[in-house]
Amino acid sequence: MYFDGYKDISILDITFDSGKAKGLSALLVRNRAFECVVVKDHALDIAHASFGGVGVSFISRNGLSYQKDTFPKSFEGGLLYTCGLDNVSNCVNGVYTHGTLHDTPAENVRYDVVDGTVYVSGYIATTGLFRHSLILHRKLCISCDGVTVIDRIENTRKVDADYCLLYHCNFGAPFLSDGGEVKVDYLTREGLTPLAKETQATASNIIFPIPNAEEVVYYHTVKDGRAEYVNRRLGIGVEITYDSDKLPYLLEWKSMAEDDYALGLESATTRFDTFRKTPINAKDTHEYIVNIKFNRFQVL
């Protein structure tokens, strides 16, 4: 769909018709320099994305899948992969890795253009018989330089509940490349694995892909709820901002492996090693806002 007065803005309602993604419903959104694929059947998460014609998101070799398999066979990455509300990582035994939210289709999906911004909205219901009833109301505000994610988690029952949440923002080649730099104004930085502990001093550095390189994860506590990645060779950067009081942990996932070359900047309600869910009172609502904004600067 094209909109009167906005020749550089379009929203195409698409369905994948081949391969593992066959049957997936999505929106192909273009707002001038920024393009992205919003997957309706994956909680309105964002798969492919580009800025100024440069691919910025990490998409794994799995690609998009309609049928869920084990996590290593299903995880596609994407600019935004929302983890929760029942699990992050493997913290809860018997629950799918990184939770079931991402694989829950959005309902009542709507979209429009107002004053040059594309708005996509819908809700994702995570419910269970004799269990919790949490509804995530999502609005995506897609501009010419990125997206603002506005989520409201509503506890619709008359009993208290709890949840966990992690915004898994993933960047890949060509945006991710040798010489790139992660910029975090951190109070503390801590490696999760033995290798990560050994390499904390170089956590910010992106290197050339290495065959079979081991992934590393670092925890950051930050001053101001902001993380950046810059590629000076391309003259493109990304800034992620959020409320660090609500999302107090920033995880940096770095895979310099040749075939799985990825960087994840992930704001979260909890760490993995000291996992704790966030309580929500009966009939209460919690709001989270995450901004993912790209920018250009002079190429060095």
Name each region found by the language model.
Residues 1-148, 159-164, 171-208, 220-300:
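Surface-exposed acidic/polar loop and edge beta-strand patches at domain peripheries
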Residues 212-216:
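C-terminal beta-strand-rich structural cap/linker in extracellular carbohydrate-active enzymes
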